Amino acid sequence: VHSLKSYFGHTLGASGVIESIICIHELKENVLFGTLGYEKPGVSMPILVQADHQEIPMKHCIKTASGFGGCNAAIVLTLPAYQKQPSRVQSSVTVHTTATVSIENSCLSMNGETVFSSSAPNFAQFIREAYKNTGGSNMKFYKMDDLCKLGYTAVEYLLKEKNFQPEEVGILLVNAAASLNTDIRHQMIINQEGDHAASPTVFVYTLPNVVAGEICIRHKIQGENTFIIEKEFDADKLEE
């Protein structure tokens, strides 16, 4: 067991990608990197952690991650020679629309019918009012950036009075720029006031896994979830 975060820090959400690349390198080179700065365990259960690099023959490794909003994940990395052969059985899945939610110009419509509208002067105020209209009380909602609030609120209406088993539902989210508007705001603060001014209140609840994670927690969804960044929305391509 080891941690790589101490080598390069948080990196605003890119650490999981960097760590995965390093894990692949470790597998290929049969070396387990030490946990930088490790001195003693901080947990009661015994775990094998070392500060020094070790040469260990490896076939597989498990990369785990814990993201903001309670979104946790794990992937298994395997050397090509030890990979299981994929099943050739393919199942046909019919995709059809059961409900739609549209949010535009301070108006929220469901299946083409307006269910909430507001005279709010800006989107930030409108989306808060739209969420309050659902009767929701998740205080984490107010920490999210506006794009996360948009996705979270839309699902509140979309899944209202829907019954399903946790494993029956997955999530596929798409937008054109991830959390770019908040990322720009975060960078402007650093440019104007320096690195010390960077604040979690600006960037913590912005990443795509936040909106996906909070939706899963709220609705007890245990299926797979994915966030795709595409310039143009193509429903047919996503279904494929």
Region spans (language model):
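Conserved "HGTGT" condensation-loop signature of ketosynthase/thiolase-family condensing enzymes
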Residues: 1-240
